[in-house]
């Protein structure tokens, strides 16, 4: 079993986006700590299965970030379950989770499942619109969400999601200083190695996503920038 607490760099692949076999191989053989499969829309059991089978040709750990209960399938190493803490809709905080547990609770392997406390900070992002996230928040608000995830709910992961835009480095630094046991994931807007390295100074895990589809070479350079290997 892999230890997620040591992961510094992960790639996130959207099953609803096209990625060539050649580029997938580059991602999986890049030295990244893991590949997360997940997206905000268009996620189906068919494209999740296609992605799973493709990634399983390689040794890299593989995680499904669950956004649709209907797209869950066995075969991943871990399952990340996001709870959008700044959503205005209870369904994205605990609602869909409750429904999933009613249906699948008896057969779930709890050693494979990790809850993520999400704080979505880009109002233009699909995930913000889907979950009706309250993005016009102050630093004090974000710190409070971090404390909620870390100290009250005792979640293993607190995820700052800027999704498509590069985040506030000082805020990331201050959030990290608040966390005692939760790991800080940062995702959003990383388009080059310099940005990845900058965020890696504060976040425990840097998530690289969109740049994979825009500039594969730049995406690959983020691995060494974060891990320093």
Curated annotation (Swiss-Prot):
EC number: 2.5.1.n9
Residues noted as binding Mg(2+) in the record, renumbered to the chain: 14, 40
Top EC class of this enzyme: transferase
Keyword annotations: Lipid biosynthesis, Lipid metabolism, Magnesium, Metal-binding, Phospholipid biosynthesis, Phospholipid metabolism, Transferase
Pfam families (UniProt xref): PcrB
Reaction it catalyzes: sn-glycerol 1-phosphate + all-trans-heptaprenyl diphosphate = 3-heptaprenyl-sn-glycero-1-phosphate + diphosphate
Names of required cofactors: Mg(2+)
Top-level division of the source organism's lineage: Bacteria
The keyword rRNA-binding belongs to this UniProt entry's keyword annotation: no
Residues reported in the UniProt entry to bind sn-glycerol 1-phosphate: 12, 159-164, 189, 209-210
Pathway: Membrane lipid metabolism; glycerophospholipid metabolism
GO biological process: glycerophospholipid biosynthetic process
Family: Belongs to the GGGP/HepGP synthase family. Group I subfamily.
NCBIfam families xref list: GGGP-family, PRK04169.1-1, PRK04169.1-3
Biological function: Prenyltransferase that catalyzes in vivo the transfer of the heptaprenyl moiety of heptaprenyl pyrophosphate (HepPP; 35 carbon atoms) to the C3 hydroxyl of sn-glycerol-1-phosphate (G1P), producing heptaprenylglyceryl phosphate (HepGP). This reaction is an ether-bond-formation step in the biosynthesis of archaea-type G1P-based membrane lipids found in Bacillales.
Complex formation: Homodimer.
Name under which the protein is recorded: Heptaprenylglyceryl phosphate synthase
Taxonomy of the source species: Bacteria, Bacillati, Bacillota, Bacilli, Bacillales
